Amino acid sequence: MPDEGQSTQISVIKGDITTMDVDVIVNAANSGLSGGGGVDGAIHAAAGPGLIEECQELFKRDGPCAAGNAVVTSGGRLKATWIVHTVGPIWDLHGPVEAPELLTRCYHSSLDIAARVNASSVAFSAISTGVYGFPKELAAPAAVSAVASWLQVKAGTHNMQDIALVCF
C-alpha cells in the first residue's frame, strides 16, 4: 500500500482510450453490457470477441448493470489488463438532480474496482456525455470532483498513481 504522502496524478487528455497502456480502462457501458455505439462499441471491437462473451456471462449471472454501478472484465486484446464497465445516467431519464449523483457513483464504483484489482493506472472514457445526453460542461467538472473526492476518502488504501480522463 502507498504511504499517506503518495500523490496521484490526475490528467485530462485527448486520445483513443482503446490504445492506452494502463492497468484499467473504464468503459461507458449500457446496462446490458452488450457493446453498442460510441466508445463502448470501439472498446468492444478493439478488445475482441472474448469481451462480449465475458459480458454476456456477467449479464446472465447478474442481470442488467444499473446506472451508477460498475463491473469488471479482462482487457481482451487491449493493452489494459482490465476493463471496468460502468453505466452512466441518462440525462433525460434521471434529471438534473439524480443524474449528477449517479455520475459520481460511476466514478467511485469504477475506482473501487480498480483499487480492488490493484491498479496503479486508470483511464476513464467520458461517461454519459454521448447518447445519454449528460451536458459536457457539467460532466467534466463532475468527473474531476468525483475522482478527487474518491482519492481524498480512500487515501492510503490504494496504489493509484495515474488517473486519466480521456476525451475524444
Protein language model features and the residues they cover:
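Glycine-/small-residue-enriched capping loops at alpha/beta junctions
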Residues: M1-R116
